[in-house]
């Protein structure tokens, strides 16, 4: 996967947008170079300064990363860029993305920077900027940063250059914050936790142990190269086997930067983000905390989520795919709970982004509070058979305008009627078109998805 855009010293070709739905990503040291990382940091500092974000005070940024080896040199480049632009920097070290977001707000920082490619393979990395308060930068600010890469700037000197120091206490601050969101003890629960050899490898087991659970950690030994390798939320079969082997009550899986959480019940069956969202929605409704009796989900959520929650008087607002769009809809509508099938669960009472560690604690807390097994809680959502086909190596920009694809899409929707759903969308981070089909039977979903994927490949390949 190649980074798009142009940066001084990088030799990257210009394309419409440098920032994807989750920051700038690419293969580290080929696409996402030290030069680009430094340029992005400098440009971000100056764009925010010119927007008045640093007015009247000395600016402060926090920088955190996942354990990828490439994160070390990218961190050095970002820190150098920020300090050279007059921004003081706290290096947080290896921490989950939601921890960086929390500390951006808790430390009243003007900017947060996360170096991670989340669930992507180890050679990839990414840079994501967070605004004051811990929310992702708005699209227009990201575009302004991209537009001004490599421009000459007035460089501060003397006392006006940024200072840099490590801030290891951030880890404990985040752990205490997560624990403070629940007073429900987890004593008696045996839980397998798979951290994908990623950023949650220390934090997630620590939180659950402090809450009283017996924790069996797997995928918690990062070496810089093994992130997401056979472990984590994108390799859930590893956790399924471990839960069965250990006789655990449940399993929790994170991705590389721990903004996701998927679960596994005692039988080893997956409990996905839709089901987790529904379980928490019922808990919050019961406690009188579910604003407007509504949750926010994406168009990729299973139709079973909407049907299951409707039976309890809970509405679902749908957004485009991406946790940033879920968050935007939550803030605009005054909703407090939202998420994605992939396991991004956002709880605005406690966090500004998806938080896998927090989600795991809240989910297990619901199990402990009700005394019900996870499989029983998850039955609130009857998942319709869902088939997803990723069509790679195609021109994703034409997926919405190709007449043949649109004709086939309309035919598929007519064929399935109210008993199913079809969605085509371009990935925000990869050269991929995703074909999603839900139907009453697996065979129907497979047949329609395969037909649409073939048409997309033929028309856009």
Curated annotation (Swiss-Prot):
Gene3D superfamilies: Alpha-D-Glucose-1,6-Bisphosphate, subunit A, domain 3, Alpha-D-phosphohexomutase, C-terminal domain
Positions of transmembrane segments: none
Keywords, alphabetical: Isomerase, Magnesium, Metal-binding, Phosphoprotein
Cofactors (names): Mg(2+)
Residues at the active site: 118 (phosphoserine intermediate)
Top-level EC class as recorded in UniProt: isomerase
Modification type Phosphoserine: residues: 118
Domain of life: Bacteria
Cofactor: how and how many bound: Binds 1 Mg(2+) ion per subunit.
Protein name: Phosphoglucosamine mutase
Annotated organism of origin: Acidothermus cellulolyticus (strain ATCC 43068 / DSM 8971 / 11B)
Gene this protein is translated from: glmM
């Amino acid at each position: 996967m190649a980074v798009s855009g142009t940066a001084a010293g990088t030799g990257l070709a210009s394309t419409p947008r440098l920032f994807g739905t989750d920051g700038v990503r690419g293969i580290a040291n080929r696409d996402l170079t030290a030069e680009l990382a430094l340029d992005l940091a400098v440009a971000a500092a100056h764009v925010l300064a010119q927007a008045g974000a640093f007015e009247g005070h000395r600016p402060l940024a926090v920088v955190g990363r996942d354990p990828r080896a490439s994160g070390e040199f990218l961190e050095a480049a970002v820190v150098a860029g920020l300090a050279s632009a007059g921004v003081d920097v706290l290096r947080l070290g290896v921490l989950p993305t939601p921890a960086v977001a929390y500390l951006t707000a808790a430390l009243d920082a003007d900017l947060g920077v996360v170096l991670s490619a989340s669930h992507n393979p180890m050679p990839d990395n990414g840079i994501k900027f967070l605004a004051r308060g811990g929310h992702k930068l708005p699209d227009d600010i990201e575009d302004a940063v991209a537009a001004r890469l490599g421009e000459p700037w007035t460089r501060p000197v003397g006392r006006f250059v940024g200072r840099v120091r490590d801030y290891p206490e951030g880890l404990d601050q985040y752990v205490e914050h997560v624990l403070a969101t629940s007073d429900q003890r987890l004593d008696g629960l045996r839980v397998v936790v798979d951290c994908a050899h990623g950023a949650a490898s220390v934090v997630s087991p620590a939180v659950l142990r402090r809450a009283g659970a017996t924790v069996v950690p797997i995928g918690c030994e990062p070496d810089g190269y093994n992130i997401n390798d056979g472990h984590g939320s994108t390799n859930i079969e590893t956790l399924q086997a471990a839960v069965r082997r250990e006789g655990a009550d449940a399993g929790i899986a994170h991705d590389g930067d721990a903004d996701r959480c998927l679960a596994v019940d005692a039988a080893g069956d997956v409990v996905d983000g839709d089901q987790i969202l529904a379980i928490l929605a019922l808990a919050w409704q019961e406690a009188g905390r579910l604003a407007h009796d509504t949750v926010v989900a994406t168009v990729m959520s299973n139709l079973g989520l909407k049907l299951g929650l409707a039976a309890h008087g809970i509405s679902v607002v749908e957004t485009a795919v991406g946790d940033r769009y879920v968050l935007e809809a939550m803030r605009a509508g005054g909703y407090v709970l939202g998420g994605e099938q992939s396991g991004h669960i956002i709880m605005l009472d406690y966090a500004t982004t998806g938080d896998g560690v927090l989600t795991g604690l809240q989910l297990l807390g619901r199990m402990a509070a009700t005394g019900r097994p996870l499989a029983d809680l998850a039955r609130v959502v009857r998942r319709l058979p869902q088939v997803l086909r990723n069509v790679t190596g195609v021109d994703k920009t034409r997926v919405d305008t190709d007449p043949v694809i649109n004709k086939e899409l309309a035919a598929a929707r007519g064929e399935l009627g109210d008993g199913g759903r079809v969605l085509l969308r371009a990935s925000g981070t990869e050269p991929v078109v995703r074909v999603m089909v839900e139907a009453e039977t697996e065979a129907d979903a497979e047949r329609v998805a395969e037909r649409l994927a073939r048409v997309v490949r033929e028309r856009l390949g």
